[in-house]
Amino acid sequence: MNNLIIGIAGGSGSGKTTLAYRLKERFGEDEVRLISHDRYYKRHDELPFAERCKLNYDHPDAFDNDLLIQHLKELKAGRAIDCPVYDYANHNRSSEVQHIEPAPVLIVEGILPLAEPELCSLFDYKIYVDTDADERILRRILRDVKERGRSLDSVIAQYRATVKPMHEAFVEPSKRNADIIIPNGGENGPAIEMLAHHIRSLIQKANLR
């Protein structure tokens, strides 16, 4: 299958997930599949919960990129995949999977998809979402406490210990691999319309319809 694969990266809380969903809304239901890089965090069944809480989830080594690369190649070949499901509250991969069928456009979003060379090479179009650090930490606190069952203290401690230093070491530098840098992610209406128009033109050029 002649898919178009788009990579969206950016710091935690930058608005990259919102951007991905806003882009999807501008296409038909069967035209786009969204895949979160977070789903491919490595499994750590061998570790107790207290130890899993201490792991660095913002380092490139935290991800099973080999599995994601395999899955993207399967989708590109026209074959469905069983995508992992990640349980944020338990800091581990769930026993459940999500069945995903191929589609003309595949969007992979996360903090580090542009930082892994082999993974990055699969993307036909690469987007980096650039958002002010203060805004990102506020969004992260609200999201992790409300949606992921985290305590305020744990979110702040993780931000200081790994999120901020890993952003500076790996996430921010990965924007040099982007084809375009978008400020403020999902809140940037004009940029979303511009991206949607560009993606449509890429689809037409690739004759994916």
Place the predicted regions along the sequence by residue.
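NTP-dependent small-molecule kinase module
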Residues: E101-P102, L142, K164-R209
